[in-house]
UniProtKB/Swiss-Prot annotation:
Enzyme Commission code(s) on record: 3.4.25.1
Class of this enzyme: hydrolase
PANTHER family given in the database record: ATP-DEPENDENT PROTEASE SUBUNIT HSLV, METALLOPROTEASE TLDD
Gene that specifies this protein: psmB
Species classification: Archaea, Methanobacteriati, Thermoplasmatota, DHVE2 group, Candidatus Aciduliprofundum
Species this protein is from: Aciduliprofundum boonei (strain DSM 19572 / T469)
Gene3D superfamilies xrefs: Glutamine Phosphoribosylpyrophosphate, subunit 1, domain 1
Entry protein name: Proteasome subunit beta
A Gene Ontology BP annotation from the UniProt entry: proteasomal protein catabolic process
Activity regulation: The formation of the proteasomal ATPase PAN-20S proteasome complex, via the docking of the C-termini of PAN into the intersubunit pockets in the alpha-rings, triggers opening of the gate for substrate entry. Interconversion between the open-gate and close-gate conformations leads to a dynamic regulation of the 20S proteasome proteolysis activity.
Amino acid sequence: MENAKTGTTTVGIVTKDGVVMGTEHRASMETFIAHKTAQKLYKLDYNIGMTTAGLVGDLQVLVRYMRAEINLYRIRRKMYMPVGAAATLLSNILNERKFFPYYVGLLVGGFDSKGYHVFAIDAAGGAIEDKYASVGSGSLFVYGVLEDRWKDDLSLDEGINLVIRGINAAMRRDAASGDGISVATITKDEGFVELSQEEVEKRMKKLKLK
């Protein structure tokens, strides 16, 4: 049986002050918009967040697995799991199922003693760290914005605006992406903090994206 095509747009970037992660809200099946407020941005722990693209059932199972393992790590070792360790754990879970895979594309981001990190992880468990990454059907449009505007000394505030710009570009051209934007920051001082929808809307108006 042929799998129904789904789509989404997710973004993660590293700034000098923290990590910014964002997604849009649309869940689709082929040309049908199945849901307009789908959650694709998750807090795994104080220092780690994850964005999800793919089949909802697979994504929700993986989020539960990761939260459980990360909580056990913190309880046993009295410390937060490093971001690289979380990416490796998720990579191993996916690789074990590579012949009967989870249909997902994931971003894991956050901070640890070595700094701020973003990892892109594919359905076969391939994990690549980069300063910025995008996963999903809208990623081609996002990368155009990121390549043009990302810089090494990007501030957290600039990073938030850049993620919003990137997702907005995808929503304009990718039919499988739309219906709003979720954004979260992950910093050493405040951990994982999701912006309110009012704040996102305010920034979009200030950037003249609405």
